[in-house]
């Protein structure tokens, strides 16, 4: 039974989060710079005070209980808030103390990371960034479970407990085989997709859903090509080989067209597109820092890519 007067300590919360993230008591103790016995005592005190078992102990590894998994994001948010409070009190100028675990979707990462990483290193030299590329659903799960701090994904996500910061809007362009009659056109109606074999990414990619949504809104019954691709780069190679056409985000077009001698066409207004932004846990104490990071990312990307910053 929990003690209603009990107040968890930051040491206990740090012990809990570290054990979950590192998967072993010894690794967690090393990460926190404390003895394993000290860490075990802090975690045991936390569980005793809460009246809840957070971790199942094993000689080989640890397992997070259902209650522990439910409470993990709140523990992480409390630690983040305390770190932000301490940093502010000390006059800390770094926007993110202790680094940032950033997720990106596969149709964003390869095209903006070179600009982002170089620019962030220059603008925020003390920022420690760890990058993870994955599909939207997996990134949102990682956010909810505390495995990521933030993620660059297509908005809106409309997921409980997740906050969004819009960064930029970008158009889609039509990728065509070399020499295609539509190549170079600037006002292709979206209804033209009805006469073209449309090549889609695998299920789970948000670009696939966005492409099908564009077809639905245009009243188009798309003729789907028999080929599906796991990545945008593979889709482009298939288009170059004459297996169909596909939609590309504007930020990806320069890279992919140079690689593959791809034909490109622009859609007629209103041009279909997407909004990219930064998602993070709404309970996080770092929302102001994430807004600063999002602003810098937008400024960096807009200098290299044809995107429109969201005010």
Curated annotation (Swiss-Prot):
HTH lysR-type domain mapped to chain residues: 8-65
Family annotation (InterPro entries): LysR_subst-bd, Tscrpt_reg_HTH_LysR, WH-like_DNA-bd_sf, WH_DNA-bd_sf
SUPFAM superfamilies tied to this protein: Periplasmic binding protein-like II, Winged helix' DNA-binding domain
The entry's keywords: Activator, DNA-binding, Transcription, Transcription regulation
GO molecular function, one term: DNA-binding transcription factor activity
DNA-binding feature ranges: 25-44
Pfam families, A to Z: HTH_1 (PF00126), LysR_substrate (PF03466)
Record GO cellular component, one term: protein-DNA complex
Keyword rRNA processing on entry: no
Top-rank taxon: Bacteria
Keyword hit for Zinc-finger: no
Protein role: Required for the induction the katG gene for catalase. Involved in the response to hydrogen peroxide.
Similarity comment: family membership: Belongs to the LysR transcriptional regulatory family.
PANTHER family: HYDROGEN PEROXIDE-INDUCIBLE GENES ACTIVATOR (PTHR30346:SF26), TRANSCRIPTIONAL DUAL REGULATOR HCAR-RELATED (PTHR30346)
Name recorded for this polypeptide: Probable hydrogen peroxide-inducible genes activator
Gene: oxyR
């Amino acid at each position: 039974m929990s003690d209603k007067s009990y107040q968890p300590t930051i040491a206990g919360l740090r012990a809990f989060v570290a054990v979950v993230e590192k998967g072993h008591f010894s690794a967690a103790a090393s990460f926190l710079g404390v003895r394993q016995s000290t860490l075990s005592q802090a975690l045991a005190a936390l569980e005793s005070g809460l009246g809840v078992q957070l971790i199942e102990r094993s000689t080989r590894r640890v397992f997070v209980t259902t209650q522990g998994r439910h409470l993990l994001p709140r523990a992480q948010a409390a630690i983040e808030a305390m770190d932000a409070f301490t940093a502010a009190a000390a006059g800390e100028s770094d926007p993110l103390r202790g680094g940032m675990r950033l997720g990106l979707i596969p149709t964003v990462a390869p095209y903006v990371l070179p600009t982002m990483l170089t620019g962030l290193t220059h603008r925020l030299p003390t920022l420690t960034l760890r990058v993870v590329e994955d599909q939207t659903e997996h990134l949102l799960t990682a956010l909810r479970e505390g495995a990521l701090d933030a993620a660059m994904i297509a908005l809106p996500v409309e997921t409980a407990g997740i906050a969004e910061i819009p960064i930029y809007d970008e158009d889609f362009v039509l990728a065509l085989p070399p020499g295609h009659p539509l190549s170079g056109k600037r006002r292709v109606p979206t209804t033209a997709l009805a006469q073209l074999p449309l090549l889609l990414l695998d299920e789970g990619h948000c670009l696939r859903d966005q492409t099908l949504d564009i077809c639905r809104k245009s009243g188009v019954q798309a003729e789907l090509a028999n080929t599906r691709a796991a990545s945008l780069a593979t889709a482009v190679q298939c288009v170059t080989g004459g297996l169909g056409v596909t939609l590309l985000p504007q930020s990806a077009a320069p890279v992919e067209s140079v690689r593959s001698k791809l034909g490109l066409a622009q859609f007629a207004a209103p041009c279909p597109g997407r909004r990219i932004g930064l998602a993070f846990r709404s309970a996080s104490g770092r929302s102001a820092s994430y807004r600063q990071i999002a602003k810098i990312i937008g400024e960096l990307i807009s200098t290299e890519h044809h995107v429109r910053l969201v005010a």
